[in-house]
């Protein structure tokens, strides 16, 4: 009879895990991938597009090397280490140049970038990644524009994804879409004004009647046509006391708002943290000496924070065994690659003075 008197076991309740992985089904569904309307709007500004491309070209061309830290008796020394397979091909579907450049792009505009671990080796460490566009990521536990640490509640395309399989790059510089709205909005409105002015046909001369019987519209049109016809045959004109000739003082620099556009380009260079001269903005008498020095300026003032962010994130314990790390071979970019061009390039300041 015990079979009829035993109490049924209560149903087990399964708590929804914050790191659910339903979002992984959206990975590589490129039909749904987006880069964000704000980013697309920002990239319409030529100065910002130039700054972005310059910095992306640096990060995209740098090779990654692996090292191990060892004590040599005086200090910690970085000793070259045999690279893991993914260093040569981070994502098997694309080149390192591509994934690193677009990782930087996410850091620049959104302040964060994300890779998803698609494969792991037998020791549990990642061996292949794919990039998740930052515009498709939502952090449920961090809703502000400033990151406070790695998130454990990540949505990809609206679906939860396991944070343990997501490598989170957190930029030390706040994303442009959060800091540059006003400057970009001004630049776009200025560009719209310049476009309108470029389409307007301003007359070179205005004939204004200042006395006598008012002329009809047809008579005014005939007088203007006669004036234009006379200019084809002679540079001299004669008018009576009832007509005033007013030359148009509008010049191309005023019509196209050259000074305003130049100033706004400097503002965008400041926003992107790149030296203004690298984005072809006039800055008075300042000029660089060689392409090598320009490369150093671009690295020091613009690229270095993002390079450090990427290489330190990829050296973390969730990517590599403790004691090993990866870094960009920046010396080959700063010294070897541009050594010949630095020696052969003439002094830019002398060229300007001799022009």
Language-model region placement:
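Structured, contiguous alpha/beta core segments that scaffold functional sites
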Residues: 1-257, 261-263, 267, 339-355
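Short acidic alpha-helical/loop segments enriched in Asp/Glu that coordinate divalent cations
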Residues: 236-239, 276-287, 316-320
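Flexible loop/turn segments at secondary-structure boundaries
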Residues: 245-247, 285-288, 336
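An amphipathic, hydrophobic-aromatic interaction surface with interspersed Lys/Arg
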Residues: 270-272, 309
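Long, compositionally biased
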Residues: 295-330
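Charged substrate- and nucleic-acid-binding regions of tRNA-handling and nucleotidyl-transfer enzymes
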Residues: 317-355
